[in-house]
Amino acid sequence: MKKLYKFLLNALPRPLLIRLSYIFKFFAPFLYRGSAVECPVCERSFSKFLSYGSKVTHRENVLCPYDLTLERHRLMWLYLQRETNFFTAQKLKVLHIAPEQCFLPHFKKQKNLDYITADLVSPIADLHFDLHNIPLEDQQYDVVFCNHVMEHVDDPIRCMSELQRVMKNGGWAIMQVPQDVTRDVTYEDASITSPADREKHFWQKDHVRLFGMDYPQWLERAGFTVEVFDMNEKWEPAEVESYRLMKKEILYILKKS
């Protein structure tokens, strides 16, 4: 049963995986009973997490078998809980682009959030639009989330600028991307078009670039002030390991002044 479970989690496309997540939630507590790792989002412990990723980025012990969080989801959740007033502020207007299924039920029930989701096509989103031309007025949102999107779009600077435009002055945003910390400069090559080649060069079949350590400069070009959050400077190594976070992952906090 465990082998079938693991195969499905790695073989199914993530959108379909998310739709079937209720099935995994039924079996996970029984199949992976234990306390070696912990997911702060679903607040459950397991004997281990599951492996996940493409052929290029396959990783062991990273996927929560209950709510399907990965390292980046757990990092963002812990940051919001520990380092911000996201869950306690009196009122925040939030725009969430390409909303992650693991966050949706939690954010939607927060009474302090005026929470709106958006996507190009996703049926679970409240609004549908192209990030290159956001049909919203200026300075509308206190907080914006847009994770693992900029590696897909034609013009990241245009999309970032549009998101910066709809943020209020004093607002902040998180826009995580796959980032190669060994690469100084973002890698783009318009001649790479086949899914197999894109996976090889950009880590996933539908990616069109691989961001390097210059990612903050892209964000600054779009008008953001960029602050760096390094979990290793704030949190204990034991809990970073227990939550199975990616130790080299940097979280960029974007401010609009």
Can you say where each PLM-predicted feature lies in the sequence?
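S-adenosyl-L-methionine-dependent methyltransferase catalytic module, highlighting the catalytic core
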Residues: 2-6, 24-37, 154-163, 168, ...
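Conserved N-terminal segment of class I S-adenosyl-L-methionine
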Residues: 2-135, 233-253, 257
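Local beta-strand N-terminus motif with an aromatic residue
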Residues: 91, 141-142
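Hydrophobic beta-strand segment of the Class I
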Residues: 97, 144-145
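PRPP/pyrophosphate-binding module of the type I phosphoribosyltransferase fold
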Residues: 145-147, 158
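Short catalytic micro-motifs in class I SAM-dependent methyltransferases
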Residues: 148-152
